[in-house]
From Swiss-Prot:
Pfam family, any one: tRNA-synt_1b
Intracellular or extracellular location(s): Cytoplasm
Position of sequence motif 'KMSKS' region: 229-233
Gene Ontology cellular component list: cytosol
Record keyword Ligase present: yes
Subunit text: Homodimer.
The protein, known as: Tyrosine--tRNA ligase
Residues bound to ATP: 232
Matches recorded under Gene3D superfamilies: HUPs, RNA-binding S4 domain, Tyrosyl-Transfer RNA Synthetase
Assigned keywords, A-Z: Aminoacyl-tRNA synthetase, ATP-binding, Cytoplasm, Ligase, Nucleotide-binding, Protein biosynthesis, RNA-binding
Residues reported in the UniProt entry to bind L-tyrosine: 34, 169, 173
Length: 419
């Protein structure tokens, strides 16, 4: 199976400009291709990861990736299917975010070895000294207004209003393709399905200005079985930066993927062969309650994004938090991340309360009688260890890193005391 057929088999091809010509080129030649990343935040996220992994698949097949940071377009903002205009960022912010994109991409793409080693460039390099007059004469004249407003990405904003700044974005992105072709013989652009209009502006400019054929592959919007955009947890993006989304949180996200989506996501987000995924699917369907597909997803993606050690730590954290282990084996940060949904109560470090008084003061038990019953019946745990002494008083050894203590009532009801 050639790389183009594999991308299709994995559900990674939504639209292409000329499928036959593209498939032939990817089979016979080393194709130089690019993906643009506008620095709109200080980290890439799960939505970006689909494209990053697609870039990696093509590089592994012998093709040459160019990662284009939108140092110029990031100052403008892409209007595609946005309800309102993006807020403009400062040059300093865009420059800082651009640097972070590079460091994150280096985890996945090979920037060091071989003829097809990855390269990174910035479209600010060619826009910085391009005058407005030159832009209109050399680029703008190749686009009619009719052509530009026919794009679905622009149509969706016509009634609510779109500034000329954002309206011109598609021409800027089109010019990126032209420049990359002239500088590096780039002939293929990858992007999300919402980018089709901007991307074909590039193939149009390449045809008109250089009499060359450019190719486009758009990746489908990744949705779950209900049609919702995939990649968020409780409305929050899953970031690739460990400081924004911890490896543990990412691990839990994949572990909780719906059964109906698990095999599909294995094809999209892992480098397991399609044959291996078929075997996993067979075992998964035979015993869904064991959640094999989700466990493999969590292992593969967390290891890929954060490394094997971070994955193993996430597993350990999960087992200790929910399997009744000794919480003192974990650091305070891991505990707070894993139990962020649990009620937190702040108490003075020198507060000298018996366990019974503590259970009442933080609302774990409604009365002394109930507190005594819970302790006597073995329902109260401190940092995962059962405590049955009615006169027990917390000591410094119960304070993990002098920051917190976890009290659990029963199997799942956790309370976090902070100092």
């Amino acid at each position: 199976m050639n790389i183009f057929d594999e991308l299709k088999a994995r559900g990674l091809v939504f639209q292409t400009t000329d499928e036959a010509a593209l498939s032939k080129a990817l089979t016979e030649d080393m194709v130089s291709y690019y993906v643009g990343y506008d620095p709109t935040a200080d980290s890439l996220h799960l939505g970006n990861l689909v494209l990053i992994l697609t870039m990696k698949r093509l590089q592994m097949a012998g093709h040459k990736p160019y990662a284009l940071v939108g140092g110029a377009t990031g100052l403008i903002g892409d209007p595609s299917f946005k309800d309102s205009e993006r807020s403009l960022q400062t040059k300093d912010t865009v420059t800082k975010w651009s640097g972070k994109i590079r460091s994150q991409l280096e985890r996945f793409l090979d920037f060091e070895n071989g003829e097809n080693k990855a390269e990174m460039t910035n479209n600010y390099n060619w826009f910085e000294n391009l005058t407005f007059i030159d832009f209109l004469r050399d680029v703008g004249k190749h686009f009619t207004v009719n052509y530009m407003i026919s794009k679905d990405s622009v149509k969706s904003r016509m009634e609510s209003g779109i500034s000329y700044t954002e309206f011109a974005y598609q021409i800027m992105q089109g010019y990126d393709f032209y420049e990359l072709n002239q500088l590096h013989n780039v002939t293929l652009q990858l992007g999300g399905s919402d980018q089709w209009g901007n991307m074909t502006a590039g193939t149009e400019l390449l045809r008109r200005k250089a009499n060359k054929q450019g190719h486009v592959i758009t990746i489908p919007l990744i949705t779950d079985s209900t049609g919702k955009k995939f990649g968020k947890s409780e409305g929050n993006a899953i970031w690739l930066d460990a400081d924004k989304t911890s490896p543990y949180e990412m691990y839990q996200f994949w572990l909780n993927v719906d059964d109906a989506d698990a095999v599909k996501m294995l094809k999209i987000f892992t480098f397991l062969s399609l044959e291996e995924i078929a075997e996993i699917e067979e075992q998964f369907e035979a015993a869904r309650h064991e959640r094999l597909a989700q466990k493999v997803l969590a292992r593969e993606v967390v290891s890929l994004v954060h490394g094997k050690e971070a994955y193993e730590q996430a597993v350990k954290t999960s087992e200790i938090l929910f399997g009744g282990g000794d919480l003192r084996q974990l650091d305070a940060k891991s505990i707070l991340t894993g139990l962020k949904a649990a009620p937190q109560h702040q108490i003075a470090p020198d507060e000298d309360l018996t366990l019974i008084e503590l259970l009442i003061s933080v609302g774990i038990a409604p009365s002394k009688r109930q507190a005594r019953e819970d302790i006597t019946n073995g329902a109260i745990y401190i940092n995962g260890e059962r405590v049955q002494e009615l006169d027990y008083v917390l000591t410094d050894s119960d304070k993990i890193e002098n920051r917190l203590t976890v009290i659990r009532r029963g199997k799942k009801k956790n309370f976090v005391l902070t100092y």
